[in-house]
Amino acid sequence: MPDPALRLPAYVDLRLLGRCNLSCPFCFGPRHEVPSMDEKDAFRVVELLRRAEVRGVVISGGEPTLLPYLTDLVAELSEPLPSGAPGPRVVLSTNGLAPVVTMKRILPHLSWIAVPVESADLEQHQRMRTGVAPHRDRVLGLLKEVRTRHGHVRVKLGTVVTRLNATGAHSVLDLVQKDAWLPHVWKIYQMSETNYGADNRDWLAVSDDVFEDVVERCAKTAADRGVQLQVYRNSTRSGSYLFVDPDCQVVVIDEGRERRIGDLFEDQEKIAADLHGAVDLTRNAGNFSGTYPDL
């Protein structure tokens, strides 16, 4: 049974760091200068999440593969619980730039991996995923590696729609040459206007009508290739998430905005009180299970 003192939703996003080896103008994650969660705190968080018997954890950042302790952390997190029940399903959200040798150490402990490709048009993709020129090829190579050699790991491909890629997003799956390499889920994201996304919304954000038009075209592509399509809309963001940030602050989404509600270790009573109404348990579960279904 879960520890009754830890009244957390079933699905948690663990943002371990802000640091990244890309500088994407639409990023909604922590600012790059935010200090990374140290190893001791990261393992304390994992211990707490396991005691709470959360059912799924998305590990993100920043770029989590930059952390030297990541392999040990996901191994610990994914272990069966002391009761004998399965550990939480672990999702790694990564930009895909880590060397294959690094990924081979991490992949055995994952249920899902989430990677991004923004456009079939290379120039559009490079304007969105800035910092490393061959990024798209690296992601497609990782996709092939996972689908051919790590069959237990499911793959979600993500595409964020902005003014930069509105004409090329719908053709992303055309870059995947063989059906056997296709992702299990392709998720289309409306740009979240948080952090860097908020800084750059005036020149990046598209209207709801433009976004829905892109979604319609993506749906046709996904149906043609037999890939499950999921869609994130900003209107559904509130109540769907509980984030743990690098400083161990718990973050919820109220009216589309991030709100910090306390330290995970020091403010548990306050967090429990604030979570009531701030996280919709049905929406939280539906968001995770829709994006990362139990296939």
Predicted regions and their residues:
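Conserved alpha-helical substructure of the radical SAM core
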Residues: 1-92, 100-102
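Structural preference for beta-strand elements that scaffold enzyme active sites
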Residues: 11-13, 56-58, 89-91, 112-114, ...
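Generic structural signal for hydrophobic
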Residues: 49, 77, 105-106, 146, ...
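Active-site beta-loop-alpha junctions enriched in small/polar residues
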Residues: 62-64, 95-97, 118-120, 160-162, ...
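Distinct, well-ordered alpha-helical segments
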Residues: 71-74, 100-107, 166-176
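Non-cysteine beta-strand/loop elements that form the S-adenosyl-L-methionine
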Residues: 102-121, 183-193
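Radical SAM enzyme [4Fe-4S]-AdoMet core and its adjacent flexible, acidic
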Residues: 123-140, 144, 149-294
